[in-house]
Design a protein with these regions (language model features):
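Hydrolase catalytic cores
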Residues: 107, 244-337
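Secreted peptidase-domain scaffold signal
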Residues: 324-442, 501-510
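C-terminal edge strands of extracellular/lumenal beta-sandwich accessory domains
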Residues: 299, 304, 309, 397-399, ...
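Subtilisin-like serine protease catalytic core
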Residues: 4-12, 17-117, 130-135, 145-148, ...
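A cross-family glycoside hydrolase active-site/sugar-binding cleft signature
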Residues: 105-106, 137-141, 176-180, 199, ...
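Extracellular S/T/G-rich loop segment that most often corresponds to the catalytic His/Ser-adjacent loop
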Residues: 188-280
Length: 510
């Protein structure tokens, strides 16, 4: 029997979610709805004969596309394993959010359907729980060679990719997508703009901290270049946003045997279920009417900014200058974040292999819990906001405390591409046969500037990608003093008013 690795992936050697399960936090995702879409679905004990034992996976509901699940049909051990990572209530192999409500839809065999049916499944899951589903897990995808477009590329405009970006905005749900890996083959919808694409890590010295070799997220070189070039995003926009544990994860087979599995399929659900933990906390704050807390805490882009901004990059020495980060994350080439082009080039917000770093659910809680702060008054050293910025204008967040020299600042700005549904029958829903229209992405930039500066000429650090739906700053403060964060609406492509989420983490110079 293999060593039980799942607790390692949700404990402090992994995403450190187990700490949140226990007092004083007591967060397990209670009453929070999350979703799952893949080819098959988890089995439901008492309904499906193939589930011969009662796994501790309490599914809320299972579906076939946009209808009820067929008994003993589409039951798939892969889907069951992914569900287990999210919601297993088993004592031996607990999931990340054992209290969450999971809605799972099987889109069926690719032979009988394709992207339209997968879109239908995603829409159906997004509408469950009275339309209140906070995150949906995609641990599968569509190969480019099956895409009906001539000369199909990863440009964000495959039907399924457009569907995900449309649904993210329409249903306000965070899509978490397993990154492309190995020989490639499942790149659609990893070219989405509005979700989180996840690479997977393996353990190094007992800690999940190294991007594994099977991830396809390296810059293409050598003999495989032609194939791989088609399998990474067109242009400079990067696909991977975040990394999470995915190597040798212990899960249950349908018959109750424990097996070890690897891949981005098992990294993504760590992220999806972490949303449920944060959202249970958010609900608690709303119910007790806490100050600096609104329903904006439920927004998908707020979750995206919070998860990406709180990721681990470089282990803190104990002096807090690196924001208390718990591990140094390495790429396949053994380079860390400070050696990456993303660190050196303001036009590149994401490392091509690890995105902003490694998922840390406990740090995400520390990022989220200080609450929402508006630019109208000075803001605390850690927090987040959801607001709009007008074309050619900017929003300034003045940090209340002066920052410590040599300390790092982490800032993440997230916003969405606009995709419209070409709704032929005017029923406000996607139907097979309908299509979407890409209305593009507005260009926003992010700066850290001295508090008394009016322009961005003196910016200390910036993130100014022309193509990404995310800007991310991780940089050291050169001199102690007061600073402000500037969100700049650089260039209009669709609407003049752009909603955004912003998360920040700084070190005050006490």
């Amino acid at each position: 029997m293999p060593v039980l690795a799942s607790p390692a992936s949700i404990g402090e050697t992994g995403i450190d979610a187990q700490k949140l399960h226990e007092p004083p936090y007591n967060l397990i995702g209670r009453k929070i709805a999350i979703g799952q879409v893949e080819i098959g679905r988890p089995g439901q004990f008492g309904i499906d004969k193939s589930v011969s034992w009662n796994p501790a996976i309490a599914l809320e509901r299972v579906f076939f596309r946009d209808g009820p699940a067929k008994v003993n049909t589409d039951v798939d051990s892969h889907a069951g394993m992914v569900a287990g990572v999210m919601i297993s209530g088993d004592k031996t192999l607990p999931g990340v959010a054992p209290g969450a409500r999971l809605y799972s839809s099987a889109s069926g065999s690719p032979v009988e359907g394709g992207q339209p049916e997968e879109c239908l499944s995603a829409q159906h899951v997004a509408l469950q729980n009275g339309g209140d589903v906070r995150a949906i897990n995609f641990s599968f995808g569509e190969p480019l060679q099956r895409d009906p477009r001539p000369e199909a590329t990863l440009d964000g405009n495959a039907l399924l990719t457009q569907c995900i970006d449309w649904s993210a905005r329409t249903h306000d749900v965070l899509y978490v997508i397993a990154g492309n890996q190995g020989g490639g083959g499942i790149p659609i919808p990893t070219d989405n703009f509005n979700g989180i694409n996840v690479a997977y890590t393996t353990q190094r010295d007992g800690v999940f901290s190294k991007v594994d070799f099977a991830n396809l997220s390296a810059l293409p070189v050598g003999i495989g270049r032609r194939l791989i070039t088609r399998e990474i995003n067109v242009g400079p926009r990067r696909s991977i946003n975040l990394s999470a544990p995915g190597s040798k994860i212990a899960v249950y087979e349908l018959d109750g045997k424990i097996v070890e599995v690897s891949g981005t399929s098992f990294a993504a659900p760590h992220v999806t279920a972490s949303v449920a933990l944060l959202q249970e906390f958010g609900n608690r704050q709303l119910q007790s009417k806490q100050p600096n807390w609104t329903t904006d805490s439920r927004r998908n882009q707020v979750m995206r900014a919070v998860l990406l901004n709180s990721a681990d990059k470089i282990k803190d020495n104990g002096d807090g200058l690196r924001l208390g980060m718990t591990r140094t994350v390495l790429g396949k080439d053994n380079l860390n974040w400070l050696e990456s082009d993303a660190y050196k080039d303001p036009k590149i917000p994401l490392d091509i292999q690890m995105g902003t770093g490694h998922l840390n659910a406990f740090r995400a809680y520390e990022q989220f819990s200080p609450g929402q702060w508006s630019p109208e008054a000075a803001v605390p050293s850690v927090g987040w906001d959801y607001r709009t910025v007008e074309a050619k204008a900017s929003q300034d967040y003045v940090l209340e405390q002066p920052l410590k020299a040599g300390s790092f600042v982490s800032l993440t700005l997230a916003w969405e591409r606009v995709v419209d549904l070409d709704d032929k029958n005017k029923n406000n829903a996607f139907d097979v046969g309908e299509s979407f229209r890409d209305r593009g992405l507005n260009n926003l930039d992010l700066y850290l500037v001295p508090a008394d500066d009016n322009g961005t000429t003196k910016s200390v650090c910036s993130s100014v990608s022309e193509v990404d739906s995310i800007e991310h700053v991780f940089c050291p403060v050169p001199t102690a003093g007061r600073y402000k964060i500037r969100v700049q609406y650089r260039q209009q492509v669709n609407e003049a008013s752009q909603p955004y989420a912003l998360a920040w983490w700084t070190v005050p110079a006490q």
